[in-house]
Design a protein with these regions (language model features):
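Flavin-dependent oxidoreductase catalytic cores
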Residues: 1-174
């Protein structure tokens, strides 16, 4: 089931819906939801493969996709095919320190048609603890043909400036 109540709020107030973030364990539902968000005015669709909340991951949503890059690819590809607006992806470095697959994930996202990837520079197991590993984001920038957005630890004005100098396409705070 899809809940579009927030999208309806925008329609009712006359505000425009810039981007809609979506996640789920059913690939067809993600694609159909993206299509509906576009119909309601979303100019960007953001698929969240970065959520590490245990009850979300246990249902096969969010960061659970990092364990199956083929499934992640299919979800991105079907969503790209379903909409005419840009599709971006939010993800993490990998499952844990022994399973960092961010470079593979980015390649799969590129191949599937994503227009950008936002990387939370921690693993699923880390959740929001410890330090973000910006080195992996720098590696991603070096190998990616699409913009990479650093997503974490933007605590002051100096961080985004340093990030930009490193070639990262942007920075966002959680």
């Amino acid at each position: 089931m899809l809940d579009f109540s927030d999208a309806q709020i925008y329609a009712d107030t006359g505000l425009s819906l810039l981007a809609a973030q979506i996640y789920g364990n059913d690939i067809d539902l993600i694609a159909n939801g993206a299509r509906e968000f576009e119909r309601r005015g979303a100019q960007i669709v953001d698929i969240n493969f970065g959520c590490s909340v245990p009850r979300i991951v246990e249902k096969g949503c969010g960061a659970a996709y990092l364990r199956d890059p083929d499934r992640l690819y299919t979800a991105v590809q079907r969503t790209v095919e379903a909409v005419s607006v840009p599709v971006i992806v939010k993800t993490r470095l990998g499952w844990d320190d022994s399973d960092i697959n961010i470079l593979e994930v980015i390649k799969r996202c590129e191949d599937a048609g994503a227009k950008a990837v936002a990387i939370h520079a921690r693993t699923v197991v880390q959740k929001y603890k410890g330090h973000a590993n910006w080195d992996w984001i720098a590696r991603a920038v070096e190998t990616s043909s699409i913009p990479i957005i650093g997503n974490v630890d933007v605590l002051d004005a100096a961080r985004p400036q340093a990030v930009h100098q490193g070639g990262i396409g942007g920075a966002e705070s959680m």
